[in-house]
Amino acid sequence: MAKSKFERTKPHVNIGTIGHVDHGKTSLTAAITKYFGEFKAYDQIDAAPEERARGITISTAHVEYETEKRHYAHVDCPGHADYVKNMITGAAQMDGAILVVSAADGPMPQTREHILLARQVGVPAIVVFLNKVDQVDDAELLELVELEVRELLSKYDFPGDDIPIVKGSALAALEDKDKSIGEDAVRLLMSEVDNYIPTPERPVDQPFLMPIEDVFSISGRGTVVTGRVERGVIKVGEEVEIIGIRPTSKTTVTGVEMFRKLLDQGQAGDNIGALLRGIDREGIERGQVLAKPASVTPHTRFKAEAYILTKDEGGRHTPFFTNYRPQFYFRTTDVTGIVTLPEGTEMVMPGDNVAMDVSLIVPIAMEEKLRFAIREGGRTVGAGIVSKIIE
């Protein structure tokens, strides 16, 4: 029987499986599709296609499914390096994550690293699936593993005591064995995900922001800036701030056009031209943003989590040290910045992910979770995300 088309009336949420290698992320992903979507077998998911995001090649598998409440897009990555790259580049946005931990092994190094990354890149909520419980006979041992997972989550500032932990076996679900730890556990997991992972605010409901890509002057009409509206709505007659690179200034949008047609407003996702009152061609440049007044501020210093490309990925061939000065590509432009490595980190090798402090030579409209590429002479050598603003 043909599957009915996905109902787009439901709220849409992006999630993904995270956790240590071989703890069962891909098996769980397959099991979820079995009950909530169009079934995808383990090897269909495991053979993930390569994609490029911010100049970086990443293997990611995408599946979709739906519960009674929501429609989900779910990402699963075959290798650990793909997770690191995925989370840092935001290639696959995650509104929440399912952390898969093998009950037989407990938390392992990548369990910890994925939780830390989730914290750094701002994944809002995590639900835990304690997998392979059929391999543990001792109830006390299971309790101990659960406690360990909760402590680890709390250590990285997730509410470890409140996070739902569902115990089950992805394999049992796939093989239609022991229903209580198979199908029932997967159904319980998705009901926890439905209830615990918040529905993200839609981009149109957020405050207006548009990165400026190009500036034109139109004789007799004034200056037009073009770009794709990142979030929010802009209506003709509204006041906006021009932020970044230079001192912040204010102007009024006197016209919005799209495909040469005049509109009364532009909204998230639209490629528009905005006519600005009283701004000359020299008063504004690519790399600045138009934004709702007081919604975003310019900054030069921040902490970042970054992934540095390997030589094979087209990155650097050599390590870098404190005082490294590459370009940081934010939204539409490159800005030079100076890197300070954390204490105890001598150097960063190609292929590493690293927490670092960055000081830009000019301010950029910035907030936490903003992504950037690290470039040298136009060539991407890394990717990062703002984890904390310093000044």
UniProtKB/Swiss-Prot annotation:
Localisation: Cytoplasm
Binding-site list for GTP: 19-26, 76-80, 131-134
GO cellular component: cytosol
Record bears the keyword DNA damage: no
Top-rank EC class of the record's enzyme: hydrolase
Residues that bind Mg(2+): T26
Segments for region (G2): 55-59
Region (G3), start-end ranges: 76-79
Region of interest: G1: 19-26
Region G4, annotated ranges: 131-134
Major subcellular site: cytoplasm
Cited InterPro entries: EF-Tu_GTP-bd (IPR041709), EF-Tu_GTPase (IPR050055), EFTu-like_2 (IPR004161), EFTU_2 (IPR033720), G_TR_CS (IPR031157), P-loop_NTPase (IPR027417), Small_GTP-bd (IPR005225), T_Tr_GTP-bd_dom (IPR000795)
Residue ranges annotated for the tr-type G domain, each copy included: 10-201
GO molecular function, one term: GTP binding
Classification via CDD domains: EF_Tu, EFTU_II, EFTU_III
Chain residue ranges for the region called G5: 169-171
PROSITE patterns the record matches: G_TR_1, G_TR_2
Enzyme Commission designation: 3.6.5.3
Pfam (any one): GTP_EFTU_D3
Keyword Ribonucleoprotein attributed: no
Keywords from the UniProt entry: Cytoplasm, Elongation factor, GTP-binding, Hydrolase, Magnesium, Metal-binding, Nucleotide-binding, Protein biosynthesis
Protein function: GTP hydrolase that promotes the GTP-dependent binding of aminoacyl-tRNA to the A-site of ribosomes during protein biosynthesis.
Family to which the UniProt record says this protein belongs: Belongs to the TRAFAC class translation factor GTPase superfamily. Classic translation factor GTPase family. EF-Tu/EF-1A subfamily.
PANTHER family: ELONGATION FACTOR TU, MITOCHONDRIAL (PTHR43721:SF22), ELONGATION FACTOR TU-RELATED (PTHR43721)
Protein name: Elongation factor Tu
Species annotation: Bartonella henselae (strain ATCC 49882 / DSM 28221 / CCUG 30454 / Houston 1) (Rochalimaea henselae)
Lineage, broadest ranks: Bacteria, Pseudomonadati, Pseudomonadota, Alphaproteobacteria, Hyphomicrobiales
